[in-house]
Structure formats: structure tokens, C-alpha cells
Amino acid sequence: MSGDFDTIRDASSSDEVQLVRLLEEKIKSLQIEIENLRKELNYYKAEMEKMLSPPLIEAVVLDVLPDGRVLVRSSSGPNLVVNVASHIDQKLIKPGVSVALNQRGSTILEVLPQKEDPIVKTMEIVEKPNVTYSEIGGLEEQIKELREVVELPLKKPEIFREIGVEPPKGVLLYGPPGTGKTMLAKAVATESNAVFIHVVASEFAQKFVGEGARIVRELFEMAKRKAPSIIFIDEIDAIGAKRIDIGTSGEREIQRTLMQLLAELDGFNPLDNVKIIAATNRIDILDPALLRPGRFDRIIEVPLPDFRGRTEIFNIYLKKMKVEDNINLELLSQLSEGFSGADIKNVCVEAAYMAIRDGRNKVTMKDLVNAITKINVKRNNMESMKERREKYS
């Protein structure tokens, strides 16, 4: 009889242990649920506070008064003298900074981040250009000059301070299309570990009065913030042509944009970590004001490649391709007299297409010779069309 009682007692004891475990698990799950509900409640409280809080008024700081108060221009209209909230660092309050005022417009509650024009923002190339000097053929002298003027001041400005001279602020690259001006600018940005800001000068020509000058100003401000940086202005003749008094509103706007560019070139220190490189095909039409000392001090010609240069360029492109062993680079260079670097690249691409059409996986010497002939015909046709336009225009 006693044995049956012990069995019943053991069974009830094990049931109690199991029940306790179940209750503990239930408590844990309820605690987790309470924590999740508390987070959700805090989230909705924060959202309610955002919806119920009054909007702030944007203003621009005009001046900081001796007593610590600030003169601002409110977006709602008048200029106001306001106080600064105690949680804001007084050092951040400077003329030109955007701030947020409370609804009454009596106190600065927040310093707003600096605005960037979307047009200016898209000019920055976030990824470093993947171009090196070894990928540029026949321009050793130009590379040497560019490194002295741009790369050396960015990497070792103390050398110029020690010797007591200022390096040139800007470099102007000029020469026929396709000779490697853009590649030179990208290569020096790569080697200098600088932010590369690429802009075509025609982007400065805007529809509304003053917009072009504002974009130029904001471009230079962004370059200073992102320093070390290189601004590359391609086709600068679009805004830098000689000024003539036509009197049209569009011409006046371009002249205002040019004046702003000249002011920016005059306004920064050559030893700041910002360098300007400009490129043009038409140096003959540039305004003399751009070329005067203190602006584009170093003017570098980027000519069509000579025989040795064409050989180097062919070698650079062909070593990346699958070609037969009997390629004669010297002969290719002789046949491509007058070709630019871009023309030679087109020759290599066209030769590859010829091999693909024939079902081959290697480019032959014959493909390259035929490609040179084809590109030459296109160039001659373009030149004859240009002559006809000039004749009948």
C-alpha cells in the first residue's frame, strides 16, 4: 500500500516541476512581449511629439553681436535679433550659416546642415578615377609638368612654403580632341588621392539670371569642404570665350558666370588643397583674362601623338586584348599617321569587332590594318563635311 502512495507522490511532484517550468517560460515570453510593446509605445510617443511640435522657421545668420545675440534674416521676411539656445555651440554660429528659429522667432534652436545644389552634387565623382599614368602613352613631358603643378603641391605643400614660392593655382590643357586631356586629369587625381570633381563648362550656362554664377560659387565651396580635391572643367571655352558686346540676355549671363569663375580663381590660396584643371580644344578663342598670371599659370599643350607615342598607345590597348603574336606595332604606327589616342582606341575596338564577326577569339594584324583603313575613311569624310560647311556657311 505504501508503495502505491510513493508512486502517486512522485508523479505529482514531477507534474509540479513541469508546471513550474511552463510558468517560467510563459513569464519570459510575457516579459519579451512587454518589452516589445514598450518599444512600440515609445515609438508612437515620439511620432506624436513630432506631429504635435510646431514647425521651425529657417533663417540665415547675418552677424554675431558682442553680447552673444545674433542678427538673422528670417525666411518669413524681416531681419531679427535673436538669442541662442544654451545647448548650441556658439562657435557654430557664423555669418552665412543656416539656422532654425522657434515659432515665435526669438531663439535659435538648431544649426542646419549646409545645403548643396543637386547640380553641384552630381559633379563629384565619388569613386576615385581608376586611371594611372601607365595607361597614357606618348605624353611623358605633359605628365611631368602636371605632376609638378598639381600632384606635388597637394602631397608636399611644405616644400613650397619652405622655399617661399606659390605654385600655380590652375592648369590649362589644350589640344585637339581625343589626345588624352581628360585621362591626364583623372590620372593625376588618382595618384594624388584627391576627390575628383568633373564638370563640363556648358553646365554652368543656366536658364535663370545668376544661376550659373551661384553654381560656380557652390562648386568651389564644395571643393574646399572635400579637400584635397581637383576640379576638372572640360570644354572651358563654353563660358570662357572672349567677351563681346552682343547685348543678349544669354550672353550677359555667360559673362556673369565667367566673372564669378575669375573671382573664385583669384580668391583661394594656391597652397590650399584644391587644384583647378581646365581643358579646351580652342585656346585661340579664350578670354585673355583667364590666361593672365595668377589664374591658369601653367598652360600645357597636349598634341597629337608622334610615331613613338602612337606605338606606345597601340601597345597599351593591345596588351589588354587577345591578339596573335605577329603584331607589328611600328607598322601600325606608320599607317595611323595623324591619329589621336581616341582614334587608336577606336581602331582596336573595330579590329576586335572584325574578329568577332569572323568567329575568331584573337585579333590579327590584318584586322588592325583594315580597322585603320576604316577609321581613316571616317576621318576623311568628317573633314570633307567640315570643309563644305565652312565653304557654304
UniProtKB/Swiss-Prot annotation:
Record PROSITE patterns: AAA
SMART domains: AAA (SM00382)
Region (Docks into pockets in the proteasome alpha-ring to cause gate opening): 391-393
Subcellular location: Cytoplasm
GO CC terms of this entry: cytoplasm; proteasome-activating nucleotidase complex
GO BP field: proteasomal protein catabolic process; protein unfolding
Binding, ATP: 178-183, 317
Keyword match ATP-binding: yes
PANTHER family documented for this protein: 26S PROTEASOME REGULATORY SUBUNIT
Functional description taken from the UniProt entry: ATPase which is responsible for recognizing, binding, unfolding and translocation of substrate proteins into the archaeal 20S proteasome core particle. Is essential for opening the gate of the 20S proteasome via an interaction with its C-terminus, thereby allowing substrate entry and access to the site of proteolysis. Thus, the C-termini of the proteasomal ATPase function like a 'key in a lock' to induce gate opening and therefore regulate proteolysis.
Subunit-level organization: Homohexamer. The hexameric complex has a two-ring architecture resembling a top hat that caps the 20S proteasome core at one or both ends. Upon ATP-binding, the C-terminus of PAN interacts with the alpha-rings of the proteasome core by binding to the intersubunit pockets.
UniProt comment concerning the protein's domains: Consists of three main regions, an N-terminal coiled-coil domain that may assist in substrate recognition, an interdomain involved in PAN hexamerization, and a C-terminal ATPase domain of the AAA type.
Protein name per its UniProtKB record: Proteasome-activating nucleotidase
Source organism per UniProt: Saccharolobus islandicus (strain Y.N.15.51 / Yellowstone #2) (Sulfolobus islandicus)
